[in-house]
């Protein structure tokens, strides 16, 4: 009961003032009694008349109910001991040692005063440039990333150049293929012009063999051998040898209708020019060249006789295929 009566009643203003003083004067460590006496004096300055003044016991009780004072003292004593040991040993700072070394060197070499200043500047710059290991690793990672980016860019450019070379080679091959196709088409056109004579010879051969002018079916190699065997057995005369090549005999089994009959039976229909018209055949080109030559002859006949007549140049054969 006596302790409860001895407990001081703290107002809000008193607690705020105590916390402010705690920040300025910490009652812990070796100087906790000295700091507490200052806090008591500051607290009693604002006490009104008729109120009980603050004592050290009142403040310690208040702080003991809020903090673990023993733990605070242990931590504060440990910090104070480190500071005291450093002061007792009198260990100079690293900067002071560097300054002393620079002074000693300058005293030994009077002419090297400028060099000592340069060395101190270099030492300070080195200290500034020193970076922890984590930072150096980060810089190394950034460098590696940059190197990788440069490598990827070089690889991409190399791949692009290779693709361009491949496309150029393909284009050249396609151009060569187009030229070869054009030559084959021209050769086929010439063969088409020569085919009517071959067809006429085939028709004549067929008429001679039949004796009646009727068209017989072309015979394959197997059938021809079979006919030879039958003729050997029966004694009938063998058929005449065909003049056509074996490749054409193998490729075509049935003869196409002769072009003579096609020309006589059905006249060629007039072709209307369209946007997607096929290229003209060489026969049509020759007809157009013949028409042009006739017009030239008619014009030459109109020229007066005084002008000397020049020999007619043969018509130039031009291919209508676009190259």
UniProtKB/Swiss-Prot annotation:
Keywords per UniProt: Chromatin regulator, DNA damage, DNA repair, Nucleus, Transcription, Transcription regulation
Bias type Acidic residues, positions: 74-91, 166-210
One Gene Ontology cellular component: NuA4 histone acetyltransferase complex
Subcellular location: Nucleus
UniProt key word Membrane: no
Residue span of region Disordered: 74-323
Biased composition (Low complexity): 263-276
Biased composition (Basic and acidic residues): 92-111, 148-165, 283-294
Major site of localization recorded for this protein: nucleus
UniProt biased composition (Basic residues): 218-227
Gene Ontology biological-process entries: chromatin organization; DNA repair; regulation of transcription by RNA polymerase II
InterPro entries: Eaf7/MRGBP (IPR012423)
Function recorded in the entry: Component of the NuA4 histone acetyltransferase complex which is involved in transcriptional activation of selected genes principally by acetylation of nucleosomal histone H4 and H2A. The NuA4 complex is also involved in DNA repair.
Protein family per UniProt: Belongs to the EAF7 family.
SUBUNIT field: Component of the NuA4 histone acetyltransferase complex.
Protein name: Chromatin modification-related protein EAF7
Species of provenance: Debaryomyces hansenii (strain ATCC 36239 / CBS 767 / BCRC 21394 / JCM 1990 / NBRC 0083 / IGC 2968) (Yeast)
Native organism taxonomy: Eukaryota, Fungi, Dikarya, Ascomycota, Saccharomycotina
């Amino acid at each position: 009961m006596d302790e409860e009566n001895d407990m001081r009643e703290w107002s809000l203003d008193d607690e705020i003032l105590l916390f402010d003083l705690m920040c300025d004067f910490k009652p812990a460590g070796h100087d906790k009694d000295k700091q507490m006496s200052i806090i008591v004096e500051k607290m009693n300055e604002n006490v009104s008349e008729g109120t009980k003044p603050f004592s050290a016991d009142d403040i310690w009780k208040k702080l003991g109910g809020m903090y673990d004072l023993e733990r605070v003292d242990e931590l504060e004593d440990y910090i104070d001991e480190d500071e005291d040991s450093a002061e007792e040993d009198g260990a100079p700072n690293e900067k002071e040692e560097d300054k002393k070394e620079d002074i000693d060197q300058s005293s030994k070499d009077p002419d090297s005063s400028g060099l000592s200043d340069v060395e101190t500047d270099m030492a300070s710059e080195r200290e500034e440039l020193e970076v922890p290991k984590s930072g150096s690793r980060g810089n190394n990672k950034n460098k590696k990333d940059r190197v990788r980016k440069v490598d990827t860019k070089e690889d991409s450019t190399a791949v692009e150049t290779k693709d361009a070379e491949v496309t150029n080679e393909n284009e050249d091959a396609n151009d060569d293929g187009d030229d070869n196709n054009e030559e084959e088409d021209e050769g086929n056109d010439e063969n088409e012009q020569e085919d009517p004579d071959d067809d006429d010879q085939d028709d004549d051969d067929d008429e001679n063999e039949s004796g009646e002018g009727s068209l017989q079916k072309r015979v394959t190699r197997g059938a021809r051998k079979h006919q030879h065997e039958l003729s050997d057995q029966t004694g009938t005369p063998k058929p005449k040898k065909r003049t056509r090549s074996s490749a054409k005999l193998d490729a075509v089994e049935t003869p196409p209708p002769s072009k003579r009959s096609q020309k006589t039976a059905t006249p060629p229909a007039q072709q209307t020019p369209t946007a997607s018209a096929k290229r003209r055949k060489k026969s049509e080109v020759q007809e157009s060249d013949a028409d042009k030559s006739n017009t030239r002859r008619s014009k030459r006949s109109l020229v007066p006789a005084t002008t000397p007549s020049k020999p007619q140049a043969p018509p130039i054969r031009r291919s209508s295929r676009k190259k």
